[in-house]
């Protein structure tokens, strides 16, 4: 079903991050090419090695990887992506995207993408009810 499709899976700092390992596994079983981009805070909840093992691809965290291979990684990923799924999406990352802040690998890549972007919020109810989080239509997501 997803053979030949590239899914960028953004994982942010939320307790729900551990659940995304199962999602990555299901996407892989559907033959998707999965690139996992984690925020630094996400690594406090789940180890990048988990995603590397499940997807067979390097998990990207740092925007400026010292193993530079003659491509600007976030731009190359954005061009390859058929869809971006940010799950779990913390209030922090939603706020950054809504305001055009691109200060890590995930948000920088999202800013360069021209494909559909799906955001799956995961946060405290009061945080979720904040107008910035609620009005994702402002950023056409």
Model-derived segments and spans:
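Short beta-strands and strand-loop turn motifs
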Residues: 87-90, 116-125
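N-terminal phosphate-binding or glycine-rich loops at protein starts, especially the Walker A/P-loop
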Residues: 1-40, 117-121, 134
